[in-house]
Amino acid sequence: MAETTQAVQAKPKRGMSKSLRDSLVAYSSIAPNFIGFCIFTLVPMIFAIGLSFCNWDGVHPVEFTGVSNFVALLSDKTFKAAFVNTLVYAIGTVPLTLVCSLGLAMLLNQKVKFRNFFRTVSFFPYVASLVAVAAVWNMIFSPSMGPVNQILATLGVENLPKWAAGKDTAMLTVILFSVWKNMGYYMVIYLAGLQGTNPELEEAAELDGASKWQIFWNVTLPQLKPTTFFVIIMLTIASFKVYDQMYMITQGGPGNATMTLVYYIYNVAFVNTPKYGYASAVSMVLFVLVLFVTIIQFKGSSSND
């Protein structure tokens, strides 16, 4: 009896499903950013949280000290000055930059001659090198040879301000510099927001006899609420972590008049004897401060919707 052999045919391999393929493409696209976030943000943040409960100078072994770093902050006069200065800088910078950038955007959104030229000029300080613009700013506001004080002297002002060199005027100088440098960037954001407003609502309000101020306050500004919220969040975070302006103009002085939290963290961690644990404790205070203010802003925005 002849044996019959049965050919075994291999089942064809099924190709990768479309959903799986799309998922792999998506994950491969976000993987570089996610890995970079973990390496350069998440891991250092976790390390800083742990280090805030320790003493470490970068050479000797890490010594766990509990909450002693945070207790020491309560009696640290320089930390208190930096904390207050950071709040003062934020309170001065955020509303001024907001108003100036919005006003500039409203002005340059009109059909005026050389509009594109003025937009470019307004944006230039933001993209220019901070070192260059800070040097020009220090020259303009020089107490002895600056053109600003020379104009004030011509007008008969006797006690000329020392600007960045004066303890009472140094913070004001840095605030004015920051507003001037950054308002061009937020002007562009507001210009983009103005392009999304409904002109028909403004025309209807104008036909109803509303003044320009009433149209702006009751029609245009409410439509810019998402843009304004974004600008406030960005300005607040930037003002709390300010460092470069202080370093280039005042170096945190005179005295501690312009010492901010980030500048203090830098001094504690990298100047003289490094105290990485103490600097990490200060950074945790800054993190909580930014988080607290941001949550309040989100709550306020949600309640007004």
Predicted features and spans:
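Short, Lys/Arg-rich, polar N-terminal cytosolic tail immediately upstream
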Residues: 1-20
